[in-house]
Amino acid sequence: MSVIEIHGLKPLLGQVSIQGSKNAVLPMMAASLLHKGITVLSNVPLIQDVSCMRDILTCLGCRCVCQGNCLVIDARQVSETRIPEAYVTAMRSSIIVLGALLGRLGEGESCYPGGCLIGARPIDLHLMALRELGAVIREEDGILYARAGKDGLTGARIYLPYPSVGATEQAILASVLAKGVTVIRGAAMEPEIRQLCHFLNNMGAVICGMGTSQLMIQGVDVLHDSSFQVEGDRIVAGTYGAAVAAAGGNVILKGADPGSLRVPLGLLEQAGAQIIRDEEKKEIQI
């Protein structure tokens, strides 16, 4: 077992740059499949899940180039419709690629995330949303085969009985290029969903209601090349903030959005921490 040994009784001092949000960048990478062109993402965290999603995109026909924390995705040659099983079982969030493939190519194939073949499946809401949009989905030997109709996916009213982040992302990705209007009620309201919607709108999508439990998506025919900076990871920033509050000291968290950390920052202040927020610079001083 690995051991982390901490020698405490010392205050934490200085500044730290908060890496880009993992939970925001992964659906953005999946969304790049919707555009027959080039997408540039900056402030991309150099972590295993990002490498896994990059490998998935490469297997589907994308050309991905990393330049430091910048990721360039060229999706012009996407033609493969099956998400490699090894990656789906390694990273459960990879299932959202299915919605992007349906939107772009009209079909997609995937095993169940984590290799789950029996019992209650956590992607039931994903499949329900795709079916509401007109996808025909069947299972054979543990593989999901999803197909859109001959005219593609069609906008629909989707109600999520639980505000699942993954199912919300799945429905958004499948709806962007669908014909007509899609309304998602009971949508997740996490900051990462808001980021995904802003990212897609930056590519030419038409999404309204960001930050609320009801999203409205007007389908478009095509998207365009775009560049987007991923916001700092609120979980990482909150962890650093808690460490400073516990150990004492003075630290500036650069690239941390105070608006996404209202609750944890409020709790730290209740515990006695002094916090300065800079919404414009995206900085927090504790």
Pin down the residues of each PLM region:
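Structural preference for solvent-exposed beta-strand-turn elements
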Residues: 1-286
